[in-house]
């Protein structure tokens, strides 16, 4: 399984993501830089990591969406390649129109860096197959613009994957760190192959770091790709 980690000027979670994909998960992993182009089916998985691409000028992800590499990312998305946007990567995917909605400044206008509880509301995506529906997990967030908003929430109800919750899985206002509509922490695209989330699974993929709850996202991808491969040769 071949994976790419896209690096923009200002990315700062690319090495963490690369490490998890290559050394924890065993993916054949490569860095792809903002000026690069690639064949749309060259990779099985493309990850846009966290950071502050182009200094978050204008707004988070607004400049990165115009990087040359995003033309290749968009073509890959059209061809069904699995794409994950983590934090700033999620912001870039919304700016590029690959995911619906927008990420705005946190409701309290503060930068949040701490662990949160999340409820897996949809375990039927390529990114959540290893979780149970309704499972409560813990991951780290680190963002100032994670307040997700979309005008027509009913249109994406079945695309909501992760929601902020309390330790018991209750969706409450107090458990929402940034003001996101419906406590949304992660969503998938209409076709289901593009996933954006504000929490950082790469920071929660080894027990040494206090939690390996995020590892199941990458395990789910590996499981999905194996099943797709087996189906193709059946």
From Swiss-Prot:
Keywords: ATP-binding, Cytoplasm, Glutamine amidotransferase, Hydrolase, Ligase, Nucleotide-binding, Purine biosynthesis. One of its GO terms (cellular component) is cytoplasm. SUPFAM superfamilies: Class I glutamine amidotransferase-like. Residues 3-231 form the Glutamine amidotransferase type-1 domain. GO terms for molecular function: ATP binding; glutaminase activity; phosphoribosylformylglycinamidine synthase activity. Part of the FGAM synthase complex composed of 1 PurL, 1 PurQ and 2 PurS subunits. Pathway: Purine metabolism; IMP biosynthesis via de novo pathway; 5-amino-1-(5-phospho-D-ribosyl)imidazole from N(2)-formyl-N(1)-(5-phospho-D-ribosyl)glycinamide: step 1/2. The active site is at 87 (nucleophile), 200, 202. This is Phosphoribosylformylglycinamidine synthase subunit PurQ. Part of the phosphoribosylformylglycinamidine synthase complex involved in the purines biosynthetic pathway. Catalyzes the ATP-dependent conversion of formylglycinamide ribonucleotide (FGAR) and glutamine to yield formylglycinamidine ribonucleotide (FGAM) and glutamate. The FGAM synthase complex is composed of three subunits. PurQ produces an ammonia molecule by converting glutamine to glutamate. PurL transfers the ammonia molecule to FGAR to form FGAM in an ATP-dependent manner. It comes from Pseudothermotoga lettingae (strain ATCC BAA-301 / DSM 14385 / NBRC 107922 / TMO). Pfam families: GATase_5. It comes from the Bacteria. It catalyses: N(2)-formyl-N(1)-(5-phospho-beta-D-ribosyl)glycinamide + L-glutamine + ATP + H2O = 2-formamido-N(1)-(5-O-phospho-beta-D-ribosyl)acetamidine + L-glutamate + ADP + phosphate + H(+); L-glutamine + H2O = L-glutamate + NH4(+). The gene is purQ. PANTHER family: PHOSPHORIBOSYLFORMYLGLYCINAMIDINE SYNTHASE SUBUNIT PURQ.
């Amino acid at each position: 399984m071949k994976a790419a980690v896209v690096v923009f000027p200002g990315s700062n979670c690319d090495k963490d993501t690369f490490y998890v994909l290559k050394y924890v998960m065993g993916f054949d992993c490569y860095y792809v830089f903002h000026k690069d182009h690639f064949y749309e089916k060259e990779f099985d998985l493309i990850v846009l990591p966290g950071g502050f691409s182009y200094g978050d000028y204008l707004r988070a992800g607004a400049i990165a969406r115009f990087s040359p590499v995003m033309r290749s990312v968009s073509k890959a998305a059209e061809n069904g390649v699995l794409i994950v946007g983590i934090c700033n990567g999620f912001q870039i995917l919304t700016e590029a129109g690959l995911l619906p909605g927008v990420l705005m400044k946190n409701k309290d206008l503060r930068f949040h860096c701490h662990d949160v509880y999340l409820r897996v509301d949809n375990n039927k995506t390529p990114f959540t197959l290893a979780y149970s529906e309704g499972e409560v997990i813990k991951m780290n967030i680190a963002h100032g613009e994670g307040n997700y908003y979309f005008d027509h929430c009913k249109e994406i109800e079945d695309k909501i994957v992760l929601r902020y919750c309390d330790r018991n899985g209750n969706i409450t206002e107090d458990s929402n760190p940034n003001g996101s509509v419906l406590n949304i922490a992660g969503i998938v695209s209409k076709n289901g192959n593009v996933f954006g989330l504000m929490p950082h699974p790469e920071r929660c993929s080894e027990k040494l770091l206090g939690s390996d709850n995020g590892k199941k996202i990458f395990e789910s991808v590996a499981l999905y790709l194996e099943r797709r491969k087996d189906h193709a040769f059946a």
